[in-house]
């Protein structure tokens, strides 16, 4: 799985960095958890404040386009983000913790 960054801009009003990216892969579309962990490595970000907002498959290609946000702190993230997006990303973190325990 390869990630290429399309745009990376700072949004001081909302206390976050906004990243648009493209993911290339060989098999099935990667999960949000896999993409999030790869973005943490590529962008050198804290996984607690990185939120993968969208991950959309490009029809007919082994690529997906995504949009992620990296907040300055957890308080800003919880204030701004919707519950559904936080739950989607939180579930992935809990699943990762279960795998680490085994």
UniProtKB/Swiss-Prot annotation:
Metal-binding keyword on record: no
Gene Ontology biological-process annotations: translation
CC per GO annotation: ribonucleoprotein complex; ribosome
Residue ranges the record marks as coiled coil: none
Alphabetized InterPro entries for the sequence: Nucleotide-bd_a/b_plait_sf, Ribosomal_eS24, Ribosomal_eS24_CS, Ribosomal_uL23/eL15/eS24_sf
Signal peptide: none
Record keywords: Ribonucleoprotein, Ribosomal protein
GO MF annotations in UniProt: structural constituent of ribosome
Family in the record: Belongs to the eukaryotic ribosomal protein eS24 family.
Listed HAMAP family: Ribosomal_eS24
The protein, known as: Small ribosomal subunit protein eS24
Species for this entry: Methanococcus maripaludis (strain C5 / ATCC BAA-1333)
């Amino acid at each position: 799985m390869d990630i290429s960054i399309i745009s990376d801009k700072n949004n001081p009003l909302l206390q976050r960095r906004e990243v648009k990216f493209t993911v290339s892969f060989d098999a099935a579309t990667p999960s949000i958890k896999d993409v999030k962990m790869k973005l943490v490595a590529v962008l050198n970000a804290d996984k607690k404040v990185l939120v993968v907002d969208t991950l959309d498959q490009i029809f007919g290609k082994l690529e997906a386009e995504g949009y992620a946000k990296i907040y300055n702190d957890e308080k800003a993230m919880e204030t701004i983000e919707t519950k559904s997006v936080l739950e989607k990303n939180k579930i992935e973190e809990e699943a990762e913790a279960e795998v680490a325990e085994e």
